[in-house]
Amino acid sequence: MDICLEKIKIEQTWKEFLKDEFLKPYFLEIKTHYINALNEGKTIYPPANLIFNAFNLAPLQDLKIILLGQDPYHNPHQAMGLSFSVPMGVKIPPSLLNIYKELQNDLNIPMAKHGDLSKWAKQGVLLLNSILSVEANKPASHAHFGWQKFTDAVISKLSDEKEGLVFLLWGNYAKNKKVLINPQKHFILEAAHPSPLARNAFLGCKHFSKSNEILLKLGKSPIDWNLNL
């Protein structure tokens, strides 16, 4: 079972940037695990057409910020291929509520009534989970597929070939990716995870204003973090 690049539904600039990764043996292993799970009748999130949504909404040439997550939401209708994000009409998860609280504290932006972060992605925020699929109701169930090899390669390649990117690392899992990033070329902002389990240590990090300050110093347009419709 070979990898056919034409069949990988990912935005063209990213496909070109990552084509060597798609052709490596580990990516074939990911594909094999994924297809086997489908053939076993497993329900997998996000839907197949949204697995690479983070890349499809944030073209490479527009990239400014990378916001790392862990794995997709595992409940029905939540996962949409963007870290922390849920579709319109879906209840806002606790971690995202804390993100909205920090936005309000940091930039005085009223809390959004929905959880769709697509607007951020379209402005150049790569909302990247480390693991890109999950079985329904089984958190981290696809951790053994090998997705981390792919997303680690994405981070390393961005670090090596780009400059002036802002990496937002929230929680220990994301902070462990720091070793993949060249701090001489990029900006790394670390904070506790926004989950309530972190006892609200995330609040007060001011990463939204800090990111925009960095972008302005680089001569780039800031992110409009306001998600209110």
Swiss-Prot record:
Per the record, the major location class is cytoplasm
Q: GO molecular function terms here?
A: uracil DNA N-glycosylase activity
Which PROSITE patterns does UniProt cross-reference here? U_DNA_GLYCOSYLASE
Keyword Lipoprotein included in the entry's annotation? no
Give the keywords, sorted.
Cytoplasm, DNA damage, DNA repair, Hydrolase
One GO term of the biological process aspect: base-excision repair, AP site formation via deaminated base removal
Would you tell me the protein name for this molecule? Answer: Uracil-DNA glycosylase
Q: Which Pfam families match?
A: UDG
Question: Can you tell me which family this protein belongs to?
Answer: Belongs to the uracil-DNA glycosylase (UDG) superfamily. UNG family.
Entry keyword ATP-binding: no
Functional summary from the UniProt entry: Excises uracil residues from the DNA which can arise as a result of misincorporation of dUMP residues by DNA polymerase or due to deamination of cytosine.
EC number(s) on file: 3.2.2.27
